[in-house]
From Swiss-Prot:
PANTHER family: CHOLINE TRANSPORTER-LIKE (SLC FAMILY 44), CHOLINE TRANSPORTER-LIKE PROTEIN 4. The keyword Transmembrane applies. It is a multi-pass membrane protein. GO terms for cellular component: apical plasma membrane; plasma membrane. This is Choline transporter-like protein 4. Residues 58-245, 291-325, 396-464, 538-578, 637-655 are extracellular. GO terms for molecular function: antiporter activity; choline transmembrane transporter activity; thiamine pyrophosphate transmembrane transporter activity. The lineage of its organism: Eukaryota, Metazoa, Chordata, Craniata, Vertebrata. Pfam families: Choline_transpo. Choline transporter that seems to play a role in the choline-acetylcholine system and is required to the efferent innervation of hair cells in the olivocochlear bundle for the maintenance of physiological function of outer hair cells and the protection of hair cells from acoustic injury. Also described as a thiamine pyrophosphate transporter. Residues 1-36, 267-269, 347-374, 486-516, 600-615, 677-723 are cytoplasmic. It comes from Danio rerio. The keyword Glycoprotein applies. The gene is slc44a4.
Length: 723
């Protein structure tokens, strides 16, 4: 006992003196002043600047540049005068493939040096201009389709010959089967299209055979098509969401109900429910062991090995390999053994953790409104994310369109007089000014980047990201401080519930906004700076991954690991600092120091008790998310059939996307509800440590903790002497 007391005194001297008894202290201090005013002013200035950036982006930006394709004159397809023509057709897709950067195409809408027209639907077959069309008396209206030609050309009334129309690129002289990908008509030469029997005999590019023509088009446009096909996958996923959103919402509602029921059960039967939870996880592990063993034995006659299978994206193939189930079996056995050993050696600490959770449950029983606060945090985070996304989109589409004179076919006539930087106006452009170059056209190139606002778009995007991260971290900090103040009001109420303040959550929220915006912004700023460094490291690692030598890669890995650990540590310190701010109203640095010293003086209790509680709450999340995930899997994969035609799984492109969405949403919902519990446990634990240091159980300095906690710690309050 003497050695233990000596170690405690040494820790106290190293990490500050224990908290002293204060007869006037009975919970969160009401008489407080504003803290970290400089950081508060800085945060307000950043928010004001963020609003200005959003307004400028809204004034200069136009999301239609990304949402809708454009024809050669820069007019949007699918809206305005082209409302019934949602897709864009490229006369010579080969020019797009050779002259277009893929990333620029995705952002700028795939503008390339060939005529583009808006069409109602993409061509679905092969077609090439007949040789008869080149005869002197051939009429263009007999060979071209009006819909596929530029709108200014009227085939019935034109005086142009077929050759002149081709040279001026007023109509396409060939097209292939195309598919509308993001409303762009891109070649679809897969499957039976490669069969020469399905291709007209006259279909070929000049100087090439049919097979050479197909090969040239396929090879030249493969990268372009694949790039837009990836975006098309996103549209297919969006279609799945449109078909299943009602069922996704239903799954999320079930997750919310299960989470609330779990918390209500935890309030009344915390010990029983937690032990059931622990043994339930062990039972799930045991079932997994049995299942893996059963499948392992059922494949005893299989000769399939990993060397036979090789690498494949088909996961089902690996499940047919016997060694796969053996690996699963070994892993589950190890995990099960570790859990059983932890349960045996930490059983006493688990009892203390249960007591903390019971105390938190009692607090929630008196402050049920705290369970609704995650909704406030979610709404504020949704506002931050929406504002960031909309601002980023408008910034990316800022700038007036730039048109330049381009020779679409330099082999026809003398086009040397056309300068590369010669701009034009598509409304007033007259091709007769370039009589020596019949293919001269006024073509949209890109958007203006020469103005003051446009030159700083990259810097504004960086500002957008930094302000977004700061706002998100501030919202989270506000939630921590608000909940901490409410739970601290409960703990430091000596006679519960009589001494609990009225509307403790609202009072705590108002105190945080009135006095501690600067302190919360200070903590959020520190975390934001670390997150920015991590983002930069991830970018550099991705940018130079191929060029790095082993030493550089090792150094980069070490830096990423160190800053990841630093971010986790800062989050831990911030969380406890916000608790101290909510209780005592000090500035961020003082609160962080006091919280850190208090935790270090009780490091054993912190590591064991607090983390055991976190582990138990994580198991609760796992149970909720796992149950909802299994239900979603059986439903969206068609294993649970609904009567009638209410829902058909076959109508989905990727049935796993709704499953992932439900699981992810269920995790967010469970995390929101359990975060209240987690914050309550952390706050009560910190108050509990302060209670042990401030008080000794005497009549003058009684403990504020519950009788259950005092019983576990062999503590008790002495009754005041009477008479």
């Amino acid at each position: 006992m003497g050695k233990k007391k000596q170690e405690e005194e040494q820790n106290s001297s190293e990490y500050g003196a224990p908290a002293q008894y204060d007869p006037t202290f009975n919970g969160p201090i009401h008489k407080r002043s504003c803290t970290d005013i400089i950081c508060c002013v800085l945060f307000m200035l950043v928010i004001t600047g963020y609003m200005v950036v959003g307004i400028l982006a809204w004034l200069y930006g136009d999301p239609r540049h990304v949402l809708y394709p454009r024809n050669s004159t820069g007019m949007f397809c699918g809206i305005g005068q082209n409302q019934n023509k949602p897709s864009v057709l490229y006369f010579d897709i080969l020019k797009c493939a050779t002259a277009t950067n893929i990333m620029a195409a995705a952002l700028q809408g795939l503008q390339c040096p060939t005529t583009q027209v808006c069409v109602s639907s993409c061509p679905s077959g092969f077609w090439a201009l007949s040789p008869l069309a080149y005869l002197p008396n051939a009429k263009p209206a007999d060979y071209f389709q009006q819909e596929l030609c530029v709108p200014s050309l009227q085939l019935k009334d034109t005086t142009y010959t077929v050759m002149e129309i081709i040279n001026k690129e007023l109509c396409p002289y060939y097209y292939t089967p195309t598919t509308s990908v993001l409303d762009r008509c891109l070649p679809s030469l897969g499957g039976s299209a490669y069969n020469p029997s399905n291709i007209p005999a006259n279909f070929s590019l000049p100087g090439l055979s049919i097979n050479q023509t197909l090969s040239t088009i396929a090879n030249a446009t493969s990268d372009l098509t694949n790039s837009f096909n990836m975006k098309d996958v996103g549209l297919r996923i969006f279609e799945d969401f449109a078909k299943t959103w009602q069922w996704i919402v239903a799954g999320l509602v079930i997750a919310m109900v299960v989470s609330v029921l779990f918390l209500l059960l935890l309030r009344f039967t915390a010990p029983v429910l937690i032990w059931i939870l622990i043994f339930g996880v062990l039972a799930v592990g045991a079932f997994g062991i049995w299942y893996c063993y059963n499948d392992y034995m059922s494949l005893a006659s299989s000769n399939l090995t990993f060397s036979n299978v090789g690498f494949t994206t088909n996961v089902q193939v690996y499940l047919q390999v016997r060694d796969t189930w053996l690996a699963f079996l070994i892993i589950l056995c190890i995990v099960e053994a570790v859990l059983i050993l932890a349960l045996i050696f930490l059983r006493t600490r688990i009892l203390i953790a249960i007591a903390l959770i019971q105390e938190t449950s009692k607090a929630l029983g008196h402050m049920m409104s705290t369970l609704l606060y995650p909704v406030v945090t979610f709404v504020l985070l949704l506002v931050c994310v929406s504002y960031w996304g909309i601002t980023a989109l408008y910034l990316a589409t800022s700038g007036a369109p730039i048109y330049k004179v381009v020779a679409l076919n330099t082999t026809q006539g003398d086009c040397s007089n056309i300068q590369a930087n010669q701009t034009c106006d598509p409304q007033t452009f007259n091709s007769s000014r370039y009589s020596s170059c019949p293919s001269a056209r006024c073509v949209f190139i890109n958007y203006n980047t020469e103005g003051l606002f446009q030159r700083n778009l990259f810097n504004l995007q960086i500002y957008n990201v930094v302000a977004f991260l700061w706002c998100v971290n501030f919202v989270i900090a506000l939630g921590h401080c608000t909940l901490a103040g409410a739970f601290a009001s409960y703990y430091w109420a000596f006679s519960k519930p009589a001494d609990i303040p009225t509307f403790p959550l609202t009072q705590s929220f108002m105190r945080a906004l009135r006095y501690h915006v600067g302190s919360l912004a200070f903590g959020a700023l520190i975390l934001t700076l670390v997150q920015i460094v991590r983002i930069i490291l991830e970018y550099l690692d991705h940018k130079f991954k191929a060029a790095q030598n082993p030493c550089a890669r090792f150094l980069m890995c070490c830096l990423k690991c160190c800053f990841w650990c630093l971010e986790k540590f800062i989050k831990f310190i911030n969380r406890n600092a916000y608790i101290m701010i909510a209780i005592y109203g000090k500035n961020f640095c003082v609160s962080a120091k006091n919280a850190f010293f208090l935790l270090m003086r009780n490091i054993v209790r912190v590591v064991v008790l607090d983390k055991v509680t976190d582990l138990l709450l994580f198991f609760g999340k796992l149970l909720v998310v796992g149950g909802i995930g299994v239900l979603a899997f059986f439903f969206f994969s068609g294993r649970i059939q609904l009567p009638g035609n209410t829902f058909q799984t076959a109508a989905l492109n990727y049935y796993w996307m709704p499953i992932i969405t439900v699981v992810f949403g269920a995790y967010l919902i469970a995390h929101g509800f359990f975060s209240v519990y987690n914050m309550g446990v952390d706050t009560l634990f910190l108050c509990f440590l302060e209670d042990l240091e401030r008080n000794d159980g005497s009549a003058e300095k009684p403990y504020f903790m519950s009788k259950n906690l005092m019983k576990i710690l062999n503590k008790k309050n002495k009754q005041p002497k009477t008479g």
